[in-house]
């Protein structure tokens, strides 16, 4: 093991000393990630400055490739990163989240020897120096590995495999509460979730949602709360079979990685994207990082797997193949809190009351697999009350591990008060009380003693 460490360290030192000979100016260093984030109009201006021909006929990825190639010819140094996809032949490519991990001309080639040397696997986020393609080559190639999963490459070789890590119940709270600083603020969704179904790092949560109940907006609010209150968490929003305009809206409103496969793309593409995202998350958890994946929707992902999986000859009610749900269950089941550091949280939406028997079967299969459930109610949404959360049917298992005992007792008192009410009256009652306070702590302070609270807050 020590010999391997020595070899890896020597390899890194050698490549670093080689780089010292490349005395490039700061403005000659091109960051591939920053280049991919630019708008097509900005790339066209940069291409014109480099005197690249036929700019208007090039797609964005082709434009990035042309700019990189021209910059290298003029003495530039390229630094790039991406998520590794290892192909059956042994070599791999770094795919970019900016293009939803689609294969493209600007992908970075990694040789089988580099993959073996650093113990790389599909899903690893690799960063390093790259070179332009030589004569007869089609892709940029990785010259030097600087970091693996935002960590030293040597550590990647000795990490414990995800499947060998010990899963535990979530015991560290994932703060979702956003303070209401003004009386005009009407969004109390994350505060309601904190009261009825608190989330922890490593939670496997299901948002059960009929159509038009505000599930996408709820996910946006959760994403915003996570990035605001938990900056150490790596957030990925996975949109499967969604409308393109909703993808754009999510990208503009969420400060995190948003990847998508829209409804006009084939089922195989939905599956490939989901596999890349879950593998990336697993690799980060192996490095003791906290990852949160928001999935919209798990039902559509299960439909995609049902289309892609080879037919077993056994078909369940609604046209679901008997083997089709095994892989989406493995995706959802990957969420866990890890002993000695690291966690993977998955919050996914499950569609119900769509009129499709298949969706009902998928939901029934996933029901009970999560350890937290938020149920949205169509009747509440029809009254234009948001969030349309059915408080009595929503909850978290082992919530005593996440919440202070005094607060937990007050949460139970609140449930006893709300229980006799209908779902609409319950959420209206709670929202009215939350409007008068900035935080949930203030709300609990307003509550009377448990004995007197049974008659109302």
UniProtKB/Swiss-Prot annotation:
Name the record gives this protein: Transcription termination factor Rho
PROSITE patterns assigned to the protein according to its UniProt record, in alphabetical order: RHO_RNA_BD (PS51856)
Enzyme kind, highest EC tier: hydrolase
Gene3D superfamilies named in the record: 1.10.720.10, Nucleic acid-binding proteins, P-loop containing nucleotide triphosphate hydrolases
Natural source organism: Rickettsia typhi (strain ATCC VR-144 / Wilmington)
Lineage: Bacteria, Pseudomonadati, Pseudomonadota, Alphaproteobacteria, Rickettsiales
Keyword RNA-binding: yes
Residues engaged in binding ATP: 200-205, 212-217, 243
Domain (Rho RNA-BD) ranges: 77-152
PANTHER family per the UniProt record, alphabetical: TRANSCRIPTION TERMINATION FACTOR RHO
This enzyme's EC code(s): 3.6.4.-
Biological processes per GO annotation: DNA-templated transcription termination
InterPro entries in the record: AAA+_ATPase, ATPase_F1/V1/A1_a/bsu_nucl-bd, CSD, NA-bd_OB-fold, P-loop_NTPase, Rho-like_N, Rho_factor_ATP-bd, Rho_N_sf
A molecular function (GO) term: ATP hydrolysis activity
Alphabetical list of CDD domains matching this protein: Rho_CSD (cd04459), rho_factor_C (cd01128)
């Amino acid at each position: 093991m020590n010999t391997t460490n020595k070899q890896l360290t020597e390899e890194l030192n050698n490549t670093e000393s080689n780089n010292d000979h490349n005395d490039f100016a700061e403005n000659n260093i091109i960051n591939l990630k920053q280049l991919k984030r630019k708008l097509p109009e900005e790339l066209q201006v940069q291409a014109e400055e480099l005197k690249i021909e036929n700019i208007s006929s090039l797609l964005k990825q082709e434009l990035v490739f042309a700019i990189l190639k021209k910059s290298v010819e003029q003495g530039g140094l390229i630094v790039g990163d991406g998520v590794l996809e290892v192909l059956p032949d042994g070599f791999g490519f770094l795919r970019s989240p900016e293009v939803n991990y689609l294969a493209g001309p600007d992908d970075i080639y990694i040789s089988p020897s580099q993959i073996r040397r650093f113990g790389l696997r599909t899903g690893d986020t690799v960063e390093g120096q790259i070179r332009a393609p030589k004569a007869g080559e089609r892709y940029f190639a990785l010259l030097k590995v600087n970091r693996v999963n935002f960590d030293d490459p040597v550590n990647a070789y000795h990490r414990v495999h995800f499947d060998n890590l010990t899963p535990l119940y979530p015991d560290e709270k994932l703060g979702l509460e956003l303070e209401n600083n003004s009386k005009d603020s009407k969004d109390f969704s994350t505060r309601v979730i904190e009261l009825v179904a608190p989330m922890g790092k490593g939670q496997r949560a299901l948002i059960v949602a009929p159509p038009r109940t505000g599930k996408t907006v709820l996910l946006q609010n959760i994403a915003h709360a996570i990035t605001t209150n938990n900056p150490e968490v790596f957030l990925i929003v996975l949109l499967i079979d969604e409308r393109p305009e909703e993808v754009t809206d999510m990208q503009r409103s969420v400060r995190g990685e948003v990847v998508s496969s829209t409804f006009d793309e084939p089922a195989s593409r939905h599956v490939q994207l989901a596999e890349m995202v879950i593998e990336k998350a697993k690799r980060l958890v192996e490095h003791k990082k906290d990852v949160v994946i928001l999935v919209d929707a798990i039902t559509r992902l299960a439909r995609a797997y049902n289309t892609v999986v080879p037919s077993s000859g056994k078909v369940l009610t609604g046209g679901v193949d008997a083997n089709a749900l095994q892989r989406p269950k493995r995706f959802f089941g990957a969420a866990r809190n890890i002993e000695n550091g690291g966690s993977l949280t998955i919050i996914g939406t499950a569609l119900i009351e769509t009129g499709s028997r298949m969706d009902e079967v998928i939901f029934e299969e996933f029901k009970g697999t999560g350890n937290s459930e938020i149920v949205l109610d169509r009747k509440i949404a029809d009254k234009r009350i948001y969030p349309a959360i059915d408080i009595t049917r929503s909850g978290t298992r082992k919530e005593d591990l996440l919440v202070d005992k005094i607060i937990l007792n007050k949460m139970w008192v609140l449930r006893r008060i709300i229980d006799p009410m209908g779902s609409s009256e319950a959420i209206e009652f709670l929202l009215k009380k939350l409007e008068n306070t900035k935080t949930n702590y203030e709300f609990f302070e307003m509550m009377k003693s448990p004995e007197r609270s049974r008659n109302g807050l």
